[in-house]
């Protein structure tokens, strides 16, 4: 049965990538259908009950700057907020929030259920309608065909999903959900490179069986920060509660090493490679055998939940072994496991087969986002869903495209890494992956991206007004401070000198004075003659960072200008690299396989040398491809 409701975009999957994808295309104005196997699990946190962290928090802020829902949802559902690296520079500071699972899912649903242009339908997708190498729709398990101009696949770990607890394995997309085996088989029949990855989750523990008195208490920050640039004064956080910290010990490690042969990972049952930066407890004990203990964060699953998430104890060991090693840990001596931990392996598709828009190179109008591309994490998934669906929506009746770059966002770093380097293990974002960290800060994500969001129609009128007002306030106040001079013999100078290490000897602007480490905006405000009455903390923060890091920021902007030349030089999709004399067979093979869209993208493919880029540039100039 064919249902042609005139959909522009179909999004398959209601996880974190799917939610951002469906919301983005609908906000732009595309008639959007979200297909999910279960409406009740839309926005569900399948693994850890938290949003953000190092690198990940930056992604959430960028999603928010583009009008996404993740930051607002966690502001509505967060039960503990912390700024990580708060004593370090602004480039590496990151927000992290503990979530109430129930409240988070409720928040997500409240945001998308009120979204215009968005329909939601419950059914699994088993097949795609593909005509002349172009996707035209999706076919559900019950035989319904929905036609659309674009399809975005955000299917998480459901493609060929297999759950492992010890040597017991069963098919599943996650605990309690069936996998998408028919869709996995269909995708394998298409000309994509496919492989397997693995991830895992720890056992859940009944909080009533835990002794918190012997654990370290971890409180959130006060005042409580907000994730969204648009939440303050509009959204009230739920009640805030602490997390706890405990540690494994030698007994824990002995129990695990004595039973490694029973682990699905170590017995050879699992083919897929697991996440390097979120390893199972078995991996940690083996890889870091010299460590006497490993830190475990004991995280509540919600204000009204009795379940605890022991972050750091992901496992594929048998249930009996899980019980034994859990009870060897301080505070868990009488722990009752409510849900066993498990590992899950699933299909992913080589992201080098994608364009920077996340459209596939082999099937037109088909986009991949999230774990299907080899990433791990809610934040990485949401970022990809956003970009994929933006491009699906804006290219419906034109050849328009937009994608972030390494110079303007961590989302750009994420996508560029995936499409140029691919991945052999679940990819996680870190600040260390970015070249321009001082420019790509959490605090200025809106200043970097919200202008584009306004242009694309992604922000509500209210959020647009908030952003424009903030941006104008920053510009106006910085200009004023750069044009306000203080002479060394004035009363203002004498008032200032109580904050300075030495007397003023020359005339300085307020902006230059703010560059000094001993001066901040609040001290300048104490000088009544200056009439500095600004009260907006977010605006003040941008003024201070602009002053104190001005030299470094200028240097990074110059570096960006140098690399921008290559990024602007497009390579035609049908370019014949064999005509370029001097390219090695390895370089020729890689360029032909990956079909980079720009010289900049080509330069970042592993194995592509600067000499090869020079040869390519010279040839393209000679033949008129670039000027």
From Swiss-Prot:
Any GO BP annotation: tRNA wobble uridine modification
Keywords, alphabetical: Cytoplasm, FAD, Flavoprotein, NAD, tRNA processing
SMART domains assigned to the protein according to its UniProt record, in alphabetical order: GIDA_assoc_3
Record localization: Cytoplasm
Gene3D superfamilies noted in UniProt: FAD/NAD(P)-binding domain, GidA associated domain, C-terminal subdomain, tRNA uridine 5-carboxymethylaminomethyl modification enzyme MnmG/GidA
UniProt KW tRNA processing keyword: yes
Cofactor(s) the protein needs: FAD
SUPFAM superfamilies with a match to the protein in the record: FAD/NAD(P)-binding domain (SSF51905)
Domain of life: Bacteria
Annotated NAD(+) binding sites: 274-288
UniProt GO cellular component terms: cytosol
Primary residence: cytoplasm
Molecular-function GO term, any one: flavin adenine dinucleotide binding
Coiled coil: none
Function statement: NAD-binding protein involved in the addition of a carboxymethylaminomethyl (cmnm) group at the wobble position (U34) of certain tRNAs, forming tRNA-cmnm(5)s(2)U34.
Protein name, entry field: tRNA uridine 5-carboxymethylaminomethyl modification enzyme MnmG
Species annotation: Francisella tularensis subsp. holarctica (strain LVS)
GN (gene name): mnmG
């Amino acid at each position: 049965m064919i249902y042609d409701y005139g959909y522009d975009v179909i999004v398959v999957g209601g996880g974190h990538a799917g939610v951002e994808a469906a919301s983005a295309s609908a906000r732009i104005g595309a008639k959007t259908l979200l297909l999910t196997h279960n409406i009740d699990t839309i926005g569900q946190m399948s693994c850890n009950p938290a949003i953000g962290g190092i690198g990940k928090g930056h992604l959430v802020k960028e999603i928010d700057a583009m009008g996404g829902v993740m930051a607002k949802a966690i502001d509505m559902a967060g039960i503990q907020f912390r700024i990580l690296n708060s004593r370090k520079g602004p480039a590496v500071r990151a927000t992290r929030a503990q979530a109430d699972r129930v409240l988070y899912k409720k928040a997500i649903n409240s945001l998308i259920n009120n979204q215009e242009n968005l329909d939601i339908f419950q059914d699994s997708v088993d097949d795609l309608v593909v005509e002349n190498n172009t996707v035209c729709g999706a076919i559900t398990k019950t035989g319904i065909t929905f036609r659309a101009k674009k399809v975005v696949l955000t299917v998480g770990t459901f493609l060929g999903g297999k759950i492992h607890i010890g040597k017991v394995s069963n098919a599943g997309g996650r605990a309690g959900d069936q996998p998408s085996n028919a869709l996995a088989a269909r995708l394998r029949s298409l000309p994509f490179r496919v492989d397997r990855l693995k991830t895992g989750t720890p056992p859940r523990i009944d909080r009533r069986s835990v002794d918190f008195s012997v654990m370290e208490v971890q409180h959130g920050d006060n005042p409580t920060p907000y994730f969204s640039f648009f939440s303050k004064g509009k959204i009230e956080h739920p009640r805030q509660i602490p997390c706890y910290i405990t540690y494994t010990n030698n007994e824990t490690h002995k129990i695990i090493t004595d039973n490694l042969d029973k682990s699905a990972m170590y017995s050879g049952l699992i083919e897929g490679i697991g996440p390097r930066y979120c390893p199972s407890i078995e991996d940690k004990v083996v890889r870091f055998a010299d460590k006497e203990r490993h830190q475990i964060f004991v995280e509540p699953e919600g204000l009204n939940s009795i379940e605890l998430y022991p972050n750091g104890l992901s496992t594929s060991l048998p249930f009996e072994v899980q019980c034994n090693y859990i009870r060897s840990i301080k505070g868990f001596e009488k722990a009752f496991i409510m849900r066993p931990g498990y590992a899950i392996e699933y299909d992913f598709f080589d992201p080098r087969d994608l364009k920077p828009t996340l459209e596939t190179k082999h099937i037109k109008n088909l986009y991949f986002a999230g774990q299907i591309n080899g990433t791990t994490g809610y934040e990485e998934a949401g970022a990809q869903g956003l970009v994929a669906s933006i491009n699906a929506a804006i290219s419906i009746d034109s050849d328009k495209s937009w994608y972030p770059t390494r110079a303007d966002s961590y989302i750009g770093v994420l996508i560029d890494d995936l499409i140029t380097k691919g991945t052999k293990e679940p990819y996680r974002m870190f600040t260390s992956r970015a070249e321009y960290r001082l420019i790509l800060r959490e605090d200025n994500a809106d200043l970097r991206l919200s202008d584009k969001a306004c242009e694309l129609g992604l922000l509500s009128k209210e959020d647009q007004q908030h952003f424009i007002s903030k941006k104008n306030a920053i510009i106006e106040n910085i200009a004023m401070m750069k044009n306000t001079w203080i002479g060394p013999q004035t009363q203002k100078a004498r008032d200032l000198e109580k904050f300075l290490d030495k007397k003023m000897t020359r005339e300085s602007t307020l902006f230059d004075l703010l560059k000094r480490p001993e001066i901040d905006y609040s001290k300048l405000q104490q000088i009544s003659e200056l009439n500095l009455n600004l009260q907006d903390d977010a605006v003040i923060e941008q003024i201070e960072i602009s002053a104190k890091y001005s030299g470094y920021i200028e240097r990074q902007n110059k570096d960006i200008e140098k690399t921008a030349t290559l990024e602007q030089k497009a390579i035609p999709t049908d370019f014949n690299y064999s005509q370029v004399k001097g390219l090695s067979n390895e370089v020729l093979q890689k360029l032909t396989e990956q079909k980079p869209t720009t010289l900049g993208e080509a330069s970042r493919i592993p194995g592509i040398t600067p000499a090869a880029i020079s040869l390519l540039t010279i040839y393209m100039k000679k033949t008129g491809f670039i000027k």
